[in-house]
Swiss-Prot record:
Biological function: The UvrABC repair system catalyzes the recognition and processing of DNA lesions. UvrC both incises the 5' and 3' sides of the lesion. The N-terminal half is responsible for the 3' incision and the C-terminal half is responsible for the 5' incision.
Statement: the UniProt record of this protein carries the keyword RNA-binding: no
Gene name of this polypeptide: uvrC
GO function terms (MF aspect): DNA binding; excinuclease ABC activity
Protein name: UvrABC system protein C
Keyword DNA repair attributed: yes
Disulfide cysteine pairs (residue numbers): none
Subcellular location as annotated: Cytoplasm
GO biological process, alphabetically ordered: nucleotide-excision repair; SOS response
């Protein structure tokens, strides 16, 4: 490891770093950019440590994030490795361990969604979720590029093969079929209405379908339908007929690309300082869909270099799945090292291709088309957003000379003081930063006191977090005063521009008024781009707050009715809800059905029924 410590005799930072770079070897390895307090700002890998680190200081830097990084570098540490592959693996391990702020390449790095068949015997469950949790035992299918695609597949599986989707706790406590059985989306294995052998057939058919083997299912269903008819078991024959009908409908709607194979097809494009990457997911020869990413990279760098950075970030930090093939629009400069690193990390080989034919060429063309279309749309949105930030700067010229890049906005949501939630949304000139969004559950205040709620949220936020360039409050002078009070108490009042946006006359949208601490209010025209920006951010804060509030309120209301019933503790409340499958089903239960739940009995059942129906 090579580094320059705080006690270095070279006091000037620039001179110290230059001295360090001169001593770096032309060998592969990993470098860590450190801040003034020794905190890790960025981790990178290099084929040649000396050349790569020197590039940060030997050229004009166009990308604002890289400029900001270089300005904060106080020290550099390096670790030499035996190969470029080893450097890549070490880089990703360090990024996962330290989460450096300047290594955030993807704003949306949620894990992909998978359909999951549990290992529970004899009645496995069908579900979906993000990532492959180590605590879950079973088979995973996917990944699916969107929640819509995963849910659509799950609903389809339910209709066709009727596997259960309930939790194991719910399943074990059932005494009668639930609503899913009534609407023909489950065969009620919980109460023995389907044999383990018949259910196993449904499981096997589900697995075949998810693997793309629908033709085998088609043949098997025809045989079973005919056999059931010959045995005069017409109920089963009708069941298999309905499955066949749905299967044929699905086969007719399947993607054009029906060859076998699994691949991630990845295309990159850059324009106007913005880069877009499209990841097209192909499994079982079917195109499951695609997702567009806009990585925070320097667009002046070669496309292939940025694609390499994206791929390592994507496969090591976002997805849990490595297909047999990765098809790329551009050849990577370190393609062999990337391939070896992925194989080591996932424990399976992958073939990376850039020259493809026939169906694979069609997949790649589709990925390129999606990339270019998404880039064009995003660029238009970005230019509009950039124009709005410029308009805001012009409007605020008389108020501040501060550069406005990061804006944080707060809102409070409740229903007559119930389930109060505070929200914080974050925007910069690249758009919303959803990773930085936060929701705050408000406690220990008088219900309906918006001022106390805002004070609590701001105090909790800025006790730990740095201030943005602009702090936007949804509300009038009163809320602005609360924000001023909080920042004063924290000793950071002058470190940000504080604005509240209030509804104008008649509380009509478009008549908003901006309030400041040391300046007269601003009444902007309805066509003002600056006003449109602030209204958009304010509305997003409101949406984020009210969504969380409704979820909390509804959850509380569904359980609060049961909480007032004497003799009905937490365990019995949970048993009731699990037995009937939710509050709505519980409300529809008779007194006798309530008494049949273990631990309830006729006396308590009478009380529960009375409270629920008064």
């Amino acid at each position: 490891m090579v580094n320059v410590s705080e006690s270095s005799p070279i006091d000037d930072k620039k001179a110290r770093l230059k001295h360090l770079i001169q001593r770096l070897p032309n060998l592969p390895g990993v470098y860590k950019m450190l801040g003034k307090n020794g905190d890790i700002l960025y981790v990178g890998k290099a084929k040649s440590l000396k050349s790569r680190v020197n590039s940060y200081f030997a050229k004009t830097i166009d990308h604002p994030k890289t400029r900001a990084l270089v300005a904060r570098i106080h020290n550099i540490e390096t670790i030499i490795t035996r190969s470029e592959t080893e450097a890549l693996l070490l880089e990703q391990n360090l990024i996962k361990e330290y989460r450096p702020p300047y290594n955030v390449l993807l704003r949306d790095d949620k894990s992909y969604l998978y359909v999951f068949i549990s290992a529970d015997k004899p009645y496995p469950r069908l579900a979906y979720g993000r990532g492959k949790g180590n605590h879950q035992k079973g088979r995973f299918f996917g990944p699916f590029p969107s929640a819509h695609a995963a849910k659509e597949t799950l609903v389809l599986m339910q209709k066709m093969f009727q596997m259960r989707q309930c939790t194991n706790t719910f399943f074990k406590q059932r005494k009668r079929p639930c609503l899913e059985y009534q609407i023909k989306r489950c065969r009620a294995p919980c109460v023995g209405l389907v044999s383990p052998e018949e259910y196993s057939e449904d499981v096997n058919n589900t697995i075949r379908f998810l693997k793309g083997d629908s033709s085998d299912i088609h043949t098997a269903l025809i045989e079973k339908m005919e056999a059931s008819a010959e045995e005069l078991d017409f109920e089963k024959a009708v069941f298999y007929r309905d499955q066949l009908s749905m299967l044929r409908e699905v086969q007719a709607k399947q993607a054009v690309y029906t060859v076998q194979g699994e691949a991630d097809v990845i295309a990159i494009a850059s324009q106007g300082g913005m880069t877009c990457v499209n990841v097209l997911t192909v499994r079982g020869g079917r195109v499951l869909g695609g997702k567009n990413y806009f990585p925070d990279v320097d667009s002046s760098e070669p496309l292939a270099d940025n694609l390499s950075a994206f791929i390592t970030s994507f496969y090591f930090q976002v997805t849990d799945d490595l297909p047999a093939e990765i098809i790329l629009s551009d050849e990577l400069p370190d393609q062999l090292a990337v391939s070896e690193a992925l194989a080591t990390h996932f424990g399976s080989k992958v073939v990376i291709k850039t020259s493809v034919r026939e169906h694979r060429a069609e997949w790649l063309d589709l990925a390129k088309l999606n990339t270019n279309n998404a880039l064009k749309t995003k660029l238009g949105d970005y230019l509009e957003l950039h124009a709005r930030f410029g308009a805001l700067k012009d409007v605020l010229t008389e108020v501040t000379d501060r550069t406005i890049d990061r804006i944080e906005c707060f809102d409070i949501s409740h229903t007559m003081g119930e389930a109060t939630i505070g929200s914080c949304v974050v925007f910069d000139q690249g758009g919303s930063r959803r990773r930085d969004y936060r929701q705050y559950a408000i406690h220990d205040i008088v219900g309906g006191d918006d001022y106390a709620a805002m004070k609590q949220v701001l105090t909790r936020r800025y006790k730990k977090q740095p201030l943005p360039d602009l702090l936007l409050i949804d509300g009038g002078k009163g809320q602005l005063g609360i924000a001023k009070e909080v920042l004063t108490e924290l000793g950071i009042l002058g470190d940000t521009l504080l604005i509240s946006v209030a509804k104008g006359e008649g509380r009509k949208a478009g008549l908003e008024v901006l309030h400041f601490i040391d300046h007269e209010p601003l009444d902007l025209p309805m066509d003002s781009k600056a006003l449109h920006l602030l209204m958009h951010i304010r509305d997003e804060a409101h949406r984020f707050a009210i969504t969380a509030h409704r979820k909390k309120r509804d959850k509380r209301r569904s359980s609060s009715v049961l909480e007032v019933i004497p003799g009905l503790g937490e365990k019995r409340r949970r048993d009731l809800l699990n037995h009937f499958g939710g509050m709505q089903q519980l409300l529809g239960a008779s007194q006798q059905e309530l008494a049949g739940v273990q631990g309830i009995g006729p006396v308590l059942a009478k009380t529960v029924y009375k409270v629920l129906h008064e």
